[in-house]
C-alpha cells in the first residue's frame, strides 16, 4: 500500500523587500523599504522618482544587491523603457513610478516579477466627501522630481484622512497609508475594520479639515521613510 503524503516547500516568502539605486534617497546607500500589500504575502510596492537613465537594485534585505536577472519577468506598464545594464535595472525614461514586486513559491525556489506602473497617490473618504458610491478618489499632484512635494486638492470636508497608492487593480484599502509622527505609515496587514482611530489608536489618525491639503515628500530621505503633513 502506497500512502501519498504532501510535503510543503521548506522555502517561505520574504517578509521584506528593499530597493536601492542612483536616485533613491542617498544614491546607492539608502535601502528603501517597500510596503506589503494587505493580505497578499510576497507582494510589495513602493513609489519612486527615477530620472532618465536611473538604475537600481533590490533585495529581501539591505545589501543583497539583486538585479535585473533575478526577476523572472519585468512588465513595463508605464513606458519606462526598462533594460539590464551591468546587472542593474535601468530606466531610460524618467518619471514617477510605482514598483510592484511579487514573489511566488515555485518548488524550492521563489519566482519574482517586477511591474512598473505610473505612480498615483489619492485621497478618499470623509476628506473627499465620503465613501458615497460614484464619488471618485481625488488624485494628488506629483512634483517635477523628488525634491518637491506631492500635494492633494483642498479637502472638501472634515474627518479622518484616508489616502492610498493605486497599485494595479488592487482595492484602495490594500495599499492605504496614514501619517504617524509626521512619517508615512503604510497599512500593510494592520486590521482596520472601521478606521484608524478606532482600530489603531488616535496617534495613527489624522484629522483633515475642509480647505486643508495633504503634502508628501516621497523618495528623498536617507532612511527611505517618506514624510507628510496636513495643513
Residue ranges and their predicted role:
Residues 1-231:
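Insoluble glucan recognition modules
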Amino acid at each position: 500500500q502506497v500512502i501519498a503524503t504532501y510535503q510543503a516547500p521548506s522555502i517561505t516568502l520574504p517578509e521584506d523587500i528593499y530597493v536601492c539605486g542612483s536616485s533613491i534617497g542617498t544614491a546607492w546607500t539608502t535601502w528603501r523599504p517597500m510596503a506589503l500589500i494587505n493580505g497578499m504575502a510576497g507582494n510589495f510596492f513602493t513609489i519612486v522618482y527615477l530620472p532618465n537613465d536611473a538604475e537600481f537594485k533590490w533585495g529581501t534585505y539591505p545589501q543583497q544587491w539583486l538585479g535585473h536577472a533575478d526577476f523572472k519577468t519585468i512588465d513595463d506598464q508605464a513606458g519606462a523603457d526598462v533594460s539590464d545594464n551591468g546587472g542593474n535595472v535601468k530606466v531610460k525614461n524618467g518619471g514617477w513610478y510605482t514598483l510592484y514586486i511579487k514573489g511566488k513559491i515555485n518548488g524550492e525556489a521563489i519566482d519574482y516579477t517586477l511591474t512598473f506602473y505610473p505612480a498615483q497617490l489619492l485621497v478618499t473618504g470623509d476628506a473627499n466627501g465620503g465613501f458615497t458610491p460614484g464619488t471618485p478618489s481625488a488624485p494628488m499632484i506629483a512634483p517635477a522630481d523628488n525634491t518637491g512635494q506631492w500635494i492633494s486638492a483642498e479637502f472638501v470636508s472634515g474627518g479622518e484622512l484616508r489616502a492610498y497608492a493605486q497599485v494595479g487593480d488592487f482595492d484602495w484599502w490594500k495599499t492605504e497609508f496614514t501619517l504617524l509622527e509626521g512619517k508615512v505609515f503604510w497599512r500593510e496587514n494592520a486590521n482596520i475594520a472601521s478606521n484608524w482611530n478606532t482600530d489603531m489608536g488616535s496617534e495613527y489618525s489624522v484629522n483633515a479639515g475642509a480647505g486643508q491639503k495633504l503634502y508628501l515628500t516621497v523618495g528623498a530621505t536617507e532612511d527611505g521613510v517618506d514624510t507628510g503633513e496636513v495643513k
